[in-house]
Amino acid sequence: MQKNNHNEEIEKEFEEVIVNIGRVTKVVKGGRRFRFTALVVIGDRKGTVGYGFGKAKEVPDAIKKAVDDAHKNLVKVNIKGTTIAHDIEHKFNASRIVLRPASEGTGVIAGGAARPVLELAGIQDVLSKSIGSNNPNNLVRATIQALTRIKA
């Protein structure tokens, strides 16, 4: 019981955003079998962010698996005030992300799957541009890897 209470405390400290839910179809002799995938980003808005990917027969189960996976993939991000310390460009598979520091009050200027990663990491002012593939899985991973490469 004690362990369960600890997990609930950890879950309360992180916010979660569902980035993508996909339906996957397997064609069998009797028809089609549907399964679902979920991509979730979690963060505490204080410099810790993570992503998770879950697959299941039902959407809520896939989301729960993705959240559990995200708790295992947490990374720490160096934040300088409300923005990042320097420009950075990172590529993951066919997705490329460019992140630039912005002056205070600019907000998070990011599209697609990069926005929840930056917001949940606690970055309030940043400019970003995604180039190439906008596949949510690759874009989330490229953004998180770029953030981990930022030097304080």
UniProtKB/Swiss-Prot annotation:
A Pfam family matched in the record: Ribosomal_S5
Gene Ontology cellular-component annotations: small ribosomal subunit
Record's keyword terms, sorted: Ribonucleoprotein, Ribosomal protein, RNA-binding, rRNA-binding
Gene3D superfamilies per UniProt: 3.30.160.20, 3.30.230.10
Record-annotated S5 DRBM domain positions: 14-77
Taxonomic superkingdom: Bacteria
One GO-annotated biological process of the protein: translation
Entry keyword annotation includes Transmembrane: no
Signal peptide positions on this chain: none
InterPro entries: Ribosomal_Su5_D2-typ_SF, Ribosomal_uS5, Ribosomal_uS5_bac-type, Ribosomal_uS5_C, Ribosomal_uS5_N, Ribosomal_uS5_N_CS, Ribsml_uS5_D2-typ_fold_subgr
MF term (GO), any: rRNA binding
Subunit architecture: Part of the 30S ribosomal subunit. Contacts proteins S4 and S8.
Family: Belongs to the universal ribosomal protein uS5 family.
Function: With S4 and S12 plays an important role in translational accuracy.
Matches recorded under HAMAP family: Ribosomal_uS5_B
Free-text note regarding domains: The N-terminal domain interacts with the head of the 30S subunit; the C-terminal domain interacts with the body and contacts protein S4. The interaction surface between S4 and S5 is involved in control of translational fidelity.
UniProt name for this protein: Small ribosomal subunit protein uS5
